[in-house]
Regions:
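Extended, subdomain-level signal for the structured scaffold at the beginning of enzyme domains
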Residues: 1-119, 132-224
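Conserved, well-structured core segments that form or line functional sites
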Residues: 123
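Conserved active-site segments centered on acidic
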Residues: 128-130
Length: 224
């Protein structure tokens, strides 16, 4: 629950399950980790079983949450400080409503992204998790997104979400902040349309409908 707005927040299921499906179908092993470890909280609107019916058509997530073996993966995660990026081919960060409150100021999350990039790993960031790219800096103090093209949750999507629930959900807007940054190129496509962008080792996805597309770019990059 957001202390600022009182709105329930968490990760967005499709941003986890759809990339998970893409990776495992292509033969990759996937570990799910989190800043603090332990059980993860999902945004209820992203659960296809939720009475709101908002995500009722998300059959990939429905299969995941009804599988005892898969649901365990989000009930007992390792903390990101317990892993080494050198043991992985890529890092994929998912969003939802929560990262604007939980990732934005968390140095551990920023350090994971920078460590992966510095190790020559692919780093993918989707939806509101892209808020970290407003702050994450390389050892030379440059922003990770300096001279890069990237995307994230759009103002048009924030407008829709706020109007849909009748209140402001997020404390700030990624698009507004990104467009104020010098030497970086933030782009968005149509509202809630799949949009994933690759620039070197960095892959970004616009919102929950872009997770699978971002995962496919990761798979493509790993195959090069």
């Amino acid at each position: 629950m957001s202390g600022q707005t009182g709105w329930p927040i968490g990760f967005w299921w499709a941003e986890l399950t759809h990339p998970y499906w893409e990776f495992t179908e292509h033969g990759y092993d996937v570990d799910i980790v989190s800043p603090d470890g332990g059980s993860l909280s999902a945004d209820p609107w992203s659960d296809p079983r939720d009475e709101s019916g908002y995500s009722a058509s998300d059959l990939i997530t429905l299969g995941f949450v009804n599988s005892p073996d898969h649901i365990k993966l989000v009930e007992d995660t390792r903390a990101i400080t317990e892993i080494s990026v050198h043991d992985y081919d890529a890092v994929f960060m998912i969003g939802g409503q929560a990262p604007m409150y939980t990732f934005y100021q968390d140095k551990r999350v920023h350090d994971l992204a920078i460590s992966a990039h510095e190790a020559g790993k692919i780093i993918a960031v989707v939806c509101h998790a892209t808020c970290i790219l407003l702050k994450a800096r390389l050892p030379n103090s440059d922003l990770l997104v300096k001279d890069k093209t990237w995307t994230g949750f759009a103002n048009s999507e924030e407008d829709y979400a706020d109007a849909f629930v009748g209140q402001q959900i997020q404390p700030f807007r990624i698009e507004d902040e990104a467009r104020d940054l010098p030497d970086t190129n933030f782009i968005v496509h149509g509202r809630f349309r799949p949009n994933a962008v690759r620039h070197g080792l960095l892959i970004t996805g616009q919102q929950q409908y872009s997770g699978a597309a971002a995962a496919r770019l990761v798979i493509q990059a790993l195959g090069q």
